[in-house]
């Protein structure tokens, strides 16, 4: 038996999600340092400057999504997901993430970053999802750690978390609203 991500059973979704946001912020710092050291970073400057440039790039996608080779644009949320999902395995994922970011930053083309997202969510080129792992993740998370916060409560948390985890804190806080209303009682 393999236990992955064992958490205290008393941990709330808010506690777990905040912990993830802080941990991913540490991963962003690691990626930024690696990006500078690689000599193949699409952003210039120190690791701290690369972190800020990455955040600015992602935030800019909200107002100016990047075109891709498909009919889909690379939006801020898709850009964040691409970066987030490629922070797990530095030796194998960082080079691919750097290359995709380079294409986006230097060529204004979001195709490679969108491809990274599709890979992680098992979306085929024709738009079909090859499994329901994303839905299963939410179902299990929401059943294990229900969350019934309000939009106002999450807005307050998003603002606070943004201070501690400026790359993903706000998005992680808002993501908890996905669990409002879970678990849903079965109809008899």
Q: What spans do the regions from the language model cover?
A:
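A catalytic-pocket lid/entrance helix-loop region that shapes and gates access to the active site
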Residues: 2-53, 99-115, 119-125
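Alpha/beta-hydrolase fold active-site neighborhood
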Residues: 51-187
């Amino acid at each position: 038996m393999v236990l992955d991500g064992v958490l205290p059973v008393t941990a709330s979704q808010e506690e777990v999600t905040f912990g993830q946001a802080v941990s991913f912020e540490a991963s962003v710092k690691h990626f930024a340092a690696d990006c500078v050291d690689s000599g193949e970073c699409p952003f210039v400057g120190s690791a701290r400057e690369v972190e800020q440039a990455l955040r600015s790039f992602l935030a800019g996608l909200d107002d100016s999504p990047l075109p891709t080779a498909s009919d889909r644009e690379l939006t801020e949320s898709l850009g964040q997901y691409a970066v987030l999902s490629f922070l797990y395995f530095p030796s194998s994922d960082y080079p691919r993430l750097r290359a995709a970011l380079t294409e986006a930053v230097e060529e204004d083309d979001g195709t490679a970053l969108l491809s990274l997202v599709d890979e992680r969510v098992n979306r085929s080129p024709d738009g079909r999802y090859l499994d329901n792992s994303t839905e299963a993740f939410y179902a299990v998370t929401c059943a294990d750690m229900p969350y019934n916060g309000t939009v106002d409560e999450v807005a307050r948390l998003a603002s606070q978390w943004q201070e501690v985890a400026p790359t993903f804190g706000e998005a992680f806080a808002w993501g908890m609203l996905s669990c409002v209303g879970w678990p849903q009682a079965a109809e008899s």
